């Protein structure tokens, strides 16, 4: 294949270059070979797939340094000051095999909550949708008919945080008076006893990963009271209390390698060993409250054993024994994680983000500046290659997920951007704003794909189902909206 490309170039008398394919980790593929300078990504794809000898050709993207080859190699080289006398390294990146299409219309406007909708979350397979509200209830919605399913009463204050277990069989909800309740989405009934112990409101909930424990027994909570607690949901008791933060803990992540990460208004992020609660290290660098953080492996941890490329039109529960689910989740996690340890990105009231490798080092990999106001949310794309951050400065910014390098600003909202969600194929991003709209962004083109007005007031919460079929949003108008293509 490489020889055929070279022969064709000779026939056309085009300038030629010596190139070498390598993967993102620097692993060489084949030997250097000769290509015409005007070679297109389609031709590179043919050659690269021939060298990879895959049964099914992979969709690939190609990069010279950080610049993607969009129309031809020559055009990309013109925009980069690249030395073409030597062998030119071309990095290939496998892309998602399936494609998520942008949602374009609101298919349902679901009323039922009597106060603002504070959080919305699809279950790991996209079968269920849950919402938490200022009216003290959690609601489950039937996605096949797009109608209310169950109203769950038990909290006595605003429901601030909800989180699905990675097997999709339980939802944890935390409220303003510090209590945590567990719910069964198939019945709408409370599971086990109320988990009480925090003295102030719950700021975050995070489950132990499926590949670590397929029974999904443990959930961690963070609170305004400055502590993190690990709960045994089967026994209904607090297993461990992690103390050390001097102010409110704002968010929490249970990583895939046995570490828990907590971020706080004391400007630090603490890294804990989940199985015994030992503090491993404290990450310092932010000049103000740390509001938000995300892991490069978040999508694999959220979806566990669910593979979106194999999803059916009507989402189902996960099938298989606990051991099979554990093995599937572990292989998906390892594939996502790659060679290095998971990366963490944090966003702060000081307008900056930091990229960390928290399992290895307490110093940040890089500091990311550019936002003009505090950062509300930060998220890695499902393939972990891009970080998106949403801010009170009305913009969303995109950053390289490995280096932290600034890539682009997505502008269009006319007020604060509260929350963002990625499509499963990492090609699209949806944002919800104080300006009452949702917007869908094409990440590669770095432009607006779809403007979605419809809410009557601020949009606080947005989520994209893991199978890519639906977006759900909620906010101050008490209405939950479902959007489809």
Swiss-Prot record:
Would you name any one GO CC term?
nucleolus
Q: Which compartment or compartments is the protein found in?
A: Nucleus, Nucleolus
Judging by the UniProt lineage, the source's domain of life is Eukaryota
Question: Which residues does the record list as N-acetylalanine (modified residue)?
Answer: 2
Annotated positions of the Phosphoserine modification: 79
Q: What does this protein do?
A: Plays a role in regulating Notch activity. Plays a role in regulating the expression of CDKN1A and several members of the Wnt pathway, probably via its effects on Notch activity. Required during embryogenesis for inner mass cell survival.
By what name is this protein known? Notchless protein homolog 1
- Native organism is Pongo abelii
């Amino acid at each position: 294949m490489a020889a055929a490309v070279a022969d064709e170039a000779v026939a056309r008398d085009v300038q030629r270059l010596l190139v070498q394919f390598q993967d993102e980790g620097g692993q060489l593929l084949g030997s250097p070979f000769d290509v015409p300078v005007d070679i297109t990504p389609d031709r590179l794809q043919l050659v690269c797939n021939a060298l990879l000898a895959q049964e099914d050709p992979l969709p690939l993207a190609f990069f010279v340094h950080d610049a993607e080859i969009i129309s031809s190699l020559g055009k990309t080289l013109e925009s980069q000051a690249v030395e073409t006398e030597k062998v030119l390294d071309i990095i290939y990146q496998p892309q998602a095999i399936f494609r998520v299409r942008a949602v374009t219309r609101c298919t349902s406007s679901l009323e039922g909550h009597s106060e603002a909708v504070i959080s919305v979350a699809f279950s790991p397979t996209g079968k269920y949708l849950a919402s938490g509200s200022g009216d003290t209830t959690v609601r489950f919605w039937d996605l096949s008919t797009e109608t209310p399913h169950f109203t769950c009463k038990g909290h006595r204050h605003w429901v601030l945080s909800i989180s699905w277990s990675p097997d999709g069989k339980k939802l944890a909800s935390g409220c303003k008076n510090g209590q945590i309740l567990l719910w069964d989405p198939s019945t709408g009934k409370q599971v086990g006893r109320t988990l009480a112990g925090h003295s102030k409101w719950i700021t975050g909930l995070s489950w132990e990963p499926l590949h670590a424990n397929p029974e999904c027994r443990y959930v961690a909570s963070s609170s305004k009271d400055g502590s993190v607690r690990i709960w045994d949901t089967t026994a209904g008791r607090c297993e461990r209390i992690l103390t050390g933060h001097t102010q409110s803990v704002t968010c929490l992540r249970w990583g895939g390698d046995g570490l828990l990460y907590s971020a706080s208004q004391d400007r630090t992020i603490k890294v804990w060993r989940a199985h015994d609660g030992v503090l491993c290290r404290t990450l310092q660098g932010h000049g103000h409250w740390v509001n938000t953080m995300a892991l490069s492996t978040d999508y694999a941890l959220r979806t566990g054993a669910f593979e979106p490329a194999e999803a059916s039109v009507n989402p189902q529960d996960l099938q298989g024994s606990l051991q099979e689910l554990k093995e599937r989740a572990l292989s998906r996690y390892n594939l996502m994680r790659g060679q290095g340890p998971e990366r963490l990105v944090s966003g702060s009231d000081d307008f900056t983000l930091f990229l960390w490798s928290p399992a290895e080092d307490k110093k940040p990999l890089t500091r990311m500046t550019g936002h003009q106001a505090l950062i509300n949310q930060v998220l890695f794309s499902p393939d972990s290659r891009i970080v998106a951050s949403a801010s009170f400065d009305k913009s969303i910014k995109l950053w390289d997920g490995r280096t932290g390098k600034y890539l682009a600003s997505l502008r269009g909202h006319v007020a604060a951007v509260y929350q963002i969600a990625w499509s499963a194929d990492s090609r699209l991003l949806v944002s919800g704003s104080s300006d009452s709209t949702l917007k869908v962004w094409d990440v590669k083109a770095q432009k607006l794909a779809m403007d979605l007005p419809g809410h009557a007031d601020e949009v606080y919460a947005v989520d994209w189902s893991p199978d890519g079929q639906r977006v759900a949003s909620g906010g101050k108008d008490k209405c939950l909206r479902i959007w489809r293509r």
